[in-house]
Amino acid sequence: MATIQDKARALISSKMKVDESEITEDKHFFNDLGADSLDFVELSMTLEREFNVKFSEEDMSNVKTVGDIYALIEKYTK
């Protein structure tokens, strides 16, 4: 069974057009994965749909790395 991180990694890979093997918890969405603000908003909406959660603007403003998004998803799915 796929973990939250596995599912999120696959979605991030697809959205950012980056190989899954390059997506590690320390990767910064903007600096390392080349996301722009529109990519980031679209990714957050995709993750909300996939995990059936709703992130606040404050939550998302604190997300900088892949690890941050993993932690946020886990916070809302527990």
Over which residues does each language-model region extend?
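Phosphopantetheine-dependent thiolation modules in NRPS/PKS and related acyl-activating systems
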Residues: A2-A35, D39, L43-M45, E50-K78
